[in-house]
Amino acid sequence: MMDSMIIGKYVPGTSLVHRLDPRTKLITIFLFVCIVFLANNVQTYALLGLFTIGVVSLTRVPFSFLMKGLKPIIWIVLFTFLLHILMTHEGPIIFQIGFFKVYEGGLVQGIFISLRFVYLILITTLLTLTTTPIEITDGMEQLLNPLKKLKLPVHELALMMSISLRFIPTLMEETDKIMKAQMARGVDFTSGPVKERVKAIVPLLVPLFVSAFKRAEELAVAMEARGYQGGEGRTKYRKLVWTGKDTSVIVSLIVLAALLFFLRA
């Protein structure tokens, strides 16, 4: 499962999405998160699905690779689906076994919410797959620039969020290594009662925290060795340039939002 985690990883490429301004991608994610909540029927979710598939194809990232990244969250999606089936009692009963009843409203809502979750995960994952940590930092810093008037450390906030994203796959790899080392010593993480499996995770947490702090210290030393002193006076090797392609992407999102609004039930 740890090998399936792709959030935070960068896949080099020359696709249209790779070449977009990072600010465009960050704005796109923010708008998409808002747009997703406009969907409330088959037509709107189908339109969102077509948009998501279109974006995935433009990145040229193998679809099988993205599906592999969904494995860690498949249980959350299934739990969400089952929760809506059990808790939503709307519409006619379409299936019944004893006291267990499945209502049409519960089934529909379960499918819709699960699709919404998958769409959001796919689109947000594409940010790190097509954008380097430096580009994410620069993009966030530019978008948060107005907050400098409030004396907020914009560069430091952007850098902190970028490092957090970058460290997700690193921590997953460390967790995988520690789990394999513990399993070689006879620890079983996959079988037995839930209580026993929870106990087995405790010895995993201590070395993981130690490793995380060690890596954070190494990163801090490396930044100091390179003369990093915050955002003030920092120069950039590449400046962000907004092009017509970026404007077209934002316009297409606005059109998508308008279509979803008119297709709403």
From Swiss-Prot:
One cellular-component annotation, GO: plasma membrane
Record's function text: Transmembrane (T) component of an energy-coupling factor (ECF) ABC-transporter complex. Unlike classic ABC transporters this ECF transporter provides the energy necessary to transport a number of different substrates. Involved in riboflavin transport.
Subunit structure: Forms a stable energy-coupling factor (ECF) transporter complex composed of 2 membrane-embedded substrate-binding proteins (S component), 2 ATP-binding proteins (A component) and 2 transmembrane proteins (T component). May be able to interact with more than 1 S component at a time.
Phenotype of null mutants: Abolishes riboflavin uptake, cell growth less inhibited by roseoflavin, a toxic riboflavin analog.
Gene this chain is encoded by: ecfT
Keyword terms of this UniProt record: Cell membrane, Membrane, Transmembrane, Transmembrane helix, Transport
Cell inner membrane listed as a keyword: no
InterPro entries: ABC/ECF_trnsptr_transmembrane, EcfT
Similarity comment: family membership: Belongs to the energy-coupling factor EcfT family.
Pfam families recorded: CbiQ
Its membrane topology: Multi-pass membrane protein
Any one GO MF annotation of this record: transmembrane transporter activity
Membrane spanning residue stretches: 29-49, 50-70, 73-93, 107-127, 152-172, 243-263
Subcellular localization(s) per the UniProt record: Cell membrane
Descriptive protein name: Energy-coupling factor transporter transmembrane protein EcfT
